[in-house]
UniProtKB/Swiss-Prot annotation:
Protein known as: Casein kinase II subunit beta-3
Modified how: Phosphorylated by alpha subunit.
UniProt region (Disordered), positions on chain: 1-22, 34-86
Family the UniProt entry places it in: Belongs to the casein kinase 2 subunit beta family.
Function: Plays a complex role in regulating the basal catalytic activity of the alpha subunit. The tetrameric holoenzyme CK2, composed of two alpha and two beta subunits, phosphorylates the transcription factor PIF1 after an exposure to light, resulting in a proteasome-dependent degradation of PIF1 and promotion of photomorphogenesis. CK2 phosphorylates translation initiation factors. May participate in the regulation of the initiation of translation. Stimulates the binding of CCA1 to promoters.
SUPFAM superfamilies given in the database record: Casein kinase II beta subunit (SSF57798)
TM ranges: none
Record-linked Pfam families: CK_II_beta
SMART domains reported in the protein's UniProt record: CK_II_beta
GO biological process: regulation of circadian rhythm
Length: 276
């Protein structure tokens, strides 16, 4: 692919180091944002979510040679550069990265249908290169890329996959894939005591990329909370959207639990606290 895939031996960062340590996505996106500052009039965005990060990338990509970008950091193993072996697809590898448990594997036939990708080319930098990376298509001029350019393409591929994913999970196949994860409690359980460990669903508070991180929605108490894992807590909420959990429960009504019958009652020395 765009970068030599790291194996279990040899030099450089191993897969275990990448999966076991803190994923260095901020550094990759800082480089991508610097490129956007130089090449586009779009609003500069950061990978760190804040109140001013409201606009998605407004950058139209064309498949031309990428200009050189100065690197401010040493070259390190990327978390989205490719799979360990040629027999593993990029999609499978990406979904199995630590912290990406919420993602399901999007069918490649779905990605190859241009209709399903309508409007995404204007939101994702280096769209063509990112799409090739996701589909494991070798680029003829990928060997000309610098490490910094590789990282920017890889970051764009992560963003593109997330924006495709939020559409896919609203389809019949996508919901079926998410059903298995829901039944296995892959999205976590509600921390509320009276929900008794109810399995949750991922939800975004906004459909705009880089506005907020993903949360988990409890269909029992109908409230949201933060994921327990710090890795999952860094995922963009727009990759799951505001619609998914509610459409999912409408589609699979048999999976919707009953409302909790108990609620906590505050007491002082055994007496209920008066509510004014």
């Amino acid at each position: 692919m765009y970068k030599e895939r790291s194996g279990g031996g040899g030099g450089g960062s191993s897969r275990s180091e990448i999966l076991g340590g803190a994923i260095d996505r901020k550094r990759i996106n800082d480089a991508l944002n610097k490129k956007l500052e130089k090449s586009s009039t779009s609003t500069t965005t950061s990978r760190v979510f804040s109140s001013k990060d409201k606009d998605p990338f407004s950058f139209t990509s064309t498949k031309t040679q990428l200009p050189d970008v100065e690197s401010e950091t040493d070259s390190e193993g990327s978390d989205v550069s490719g799979s360990e072996g040629d027999d593993t697809s990029w999609i499978s590898w990406f979904c199995n990265l630590r912290g990406n448990d919420f993602f399901c594997e999007v069918d490649e036939d779905y990605i190859q249908d241009d209709f399903n990708l309508c409007g995404l080319s204007g939101q994702v930098p280096y769209y063509d290169y990112a799409l090739d990376l996701i589909l494991d298509v070798d680029a003829s001029n990928s060997e000309m890329f610098t490490d910094e350019q590789h990282e920017m393409v890889e970051s764009a591929a992560e963003m593109l996959y997330g924006l495709i994913h939020v559409r896919y999970i609203l389809t019949t196949k996508g919901m079926a894939a998410m059903t298995e994860k829901y039944k296995n409690c892959d999205f976590g359980r509600c921390p509320r005591v009276f929900c008794c460990g109810q399995s949750c669903l991922p939800v975004g508070q906004s459909d705009i990329p880089r506005s907020s991180t993903v949360k988990i929605y409890c269909p029992k108490c109908e409230d949201i909370s933060y994921p327990r894992s710090k890795f999952q807590g860094n995922i963009d909420g727009a990759y799951f959207g505001t619609t998914f959990p509610h459409l999912f429960l409408m589609t699979y009504g048999n999976l919707k639990p009953q409302k909790p019958t108990q609620s906590y009652v505050p007491k002082i020395f055994g007496f209920k606290v008066h509510k004014p």
